Amino acid sequence: MLIKEYRITLPFTKEEYRLGQKYMTARKTHESSNAGDNVQLLEKSSFTDKNGVKGTFTHKVFLLKKSLPRYASAILPKSALKIEEKSWNSYPNTKTIYSCPFFGEKFYLCIESIHKDGRDEEENVFGLSKDILKKRIVDHVDIARDEVEGKDVKTDEDPRMFKSKLTGRGPLTSPNWRKEVNPAMVVYKLVTVNFNYWGFQNRVENLVQTNGLREVFLKAHRSLFCWMDEWIDLSEEQIEQFEQSTYQLMMNNTIENKLNEDIKNMNISEKKGNQQNTYSKGDFKCPNVNCQHVCSECKHMLMTTTTTTTKTVTETTTTVQSPICYRNMVC
C-alpha cells in the first residue's frame, strides 16, 4: 500500500475554488466525451454524513477502450477496461473511491480531499494516526514550476504566461509565488492505493501515484487557473446549468450503451409461422411484459433506478429495475 498526501497551493479563495472546480470538472467531462472517451452517470443523489453535513453522491463508470492503445484494448478483457467511481462531495471535504471489476478486491484507490483558506500548511489536516503518518509521503504540486509532459503542454494553459483580465492575477513567474499570492488556499489530497498482486505491487502503485494521479492533479489545476476568466464571474445558477448539461451527456452515454447492449443480446429475428419479422436497431420488441408491440419510436429499455436507504458516507443502496422509455416516457 502506498499513501501520498498531495498539497496544492492556489491563488483562490476556498469559495472561488468550489465554483471553479465544478466548472473544470464539467468542462473536462465534455472534452473527454468529445475525444471519444465514455463516461456514464449511474446515480446522483443527496446524502448526509456522520457529522450531519449534507452533500452529493455520484456513481460513474469510465470506459477506457478508446483511451488505450489499440493492442492493449484488443488483448484486455472487457471488465479490465471499466473503472467505477463513487464520490461523496460535502465540500470542503470530499471522498472518492475507484474500483475495477477485473481486479476485484485486489485493487483499491481512495482519494480524500480537504480545502483550506490561507497559504500556511497543516501537517496533519486529515488527523492520521502515528502509524499512517510514518507511511505517508508528502508531495507538493506546483502548478507553475512543475514540468508537464511535452506532448501535453498547452501554451494557453501555462500559469507562467496567463494573466487574468478580470482579476489581475498571474502570471505566476516568481520562484516563491506560493508564499506571495493573495488570496491563497491549499488543496490537500490524501491518496491511498493498494494493488495486491505479488511481483507487481510496488511498480503499479508507484505508476498510479506518480504517472497517473500526480499528473492529473497538476494538469487539472493548471487548467483551472488558466480558465479563470471563463468561470470567475459565473453565478451558482450558471454553473449548475453547465453541470446539468454534463449530467445529460453522461446519461445519454448510459442510455446509448444500454441500448447497444440490449440490441446485441437480443434475437433480432423472430419466426411466426411461415413469416419472419426482422428488427433493426431502432425497431425492436419492448422488454416490458405488459407491452406486446414492436416499438420503433420510443425504444423502451430497462433502466436502473437506485434508492438510498441510509444517510452516511458508507451508505447502502437498494436497486430496483423498471422498464422506462428511451424518450423518458413510462411504458
UniProtKB/Swiss-Prot annotation:
Organism annotation: Dictyostelium discoideum (Social amoeba)
Keywords attached to this entry: Lipid-binding, Transport
SUPFAM superfamilies linked: Bet v1-like (SSF55961)
Family label: Belongs to the PtdIns transfer protein family. PI transfer class IIA subfamily.
Upper classification of the organism: Eukaryota, Amoebozoa, Evosea, Eumycetozoa, Dictyostelia
Name of protein: Phosphatidylinositol transfer protein 4
Claim: Transport is one of the keywords in the record: yes
Domain of life: Eukaryota
Annotated Pfam families: IP_trans
Record's GO cellular component terms: cytoplasm
Coiled-coil intervals, chain numbering: none
Function: Catalyzes the transfer of PtdIns and phosphatidylcholine between membranes.
Molecular function per GO: phosphatidylcholine binding; phosphatidylcholine transporter activity; phosphatidylinositol binding; phosphatidylinositol transfer activity
